[in-house]
């Protein structure tokens, strides 16, 4: 699986950069994902978790 939050499913979103002349070029807004060790089915596993999920206590580190 790609870089996506294991808990909430948050991932990068896309949009456009706009110049003063309103020309557009594609860009990405990356989610604040951190690689952490958590318990998955009783075993420690390294997964990508969003900083928001870590701060809100939805997941606990091992």
UniProtKB/Swiss-Prot annotation:
Residues 1-24 are annotated as: Disordered. The keyword Ribonucleoprotein applies. One of its GO terms (biological process) is translation. InterPro entries: Bacterial_rp_bL28, Ribosomal_bL28, Ribosomal_bL28/bL31-like_sf, Ribosomal_bL28_bact-type, Ribosomal_bL28_sf. Pfam families: Ribosomal_L28. GO terms for cellular component: ribonucleoprotein complex; ribosome. Residues 11-24 have a biased composition (Polar residues). The keyword Ribonucleoprotein applies. It comes from the Bacteria. Keywords: Ribonucleoprotein, Ribosomal protein. GO terms for molecular function: structural constituent of ribosome. NCBIfam families: L28 (TIGR00009). Belongs to the bacterial ribosomal protein bL28 family. This is Large ribosomal subunit protein bL28. It comes from Staphylococcus saprophyticus subsp. saprophyticus (strain ATCC 15305 / DSM 20229 / NCIMB 8711 / NCTC 7292 / S-41). The gene is rpmB.
């Amino acid at each position: 699986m790609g870089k996506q939050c294991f808990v909430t499913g948050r991932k990068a979103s896309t949009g456009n950069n706009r110049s003063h002349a309103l020309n557009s070029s594609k860009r990405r807004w990356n989610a604040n994902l951190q690689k952490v060790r958590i318990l998955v089915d009783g075993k420690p596993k390294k997964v990508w978790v969003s900083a928001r999920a870590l701060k809100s206590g939805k997941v606990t580190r091992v």
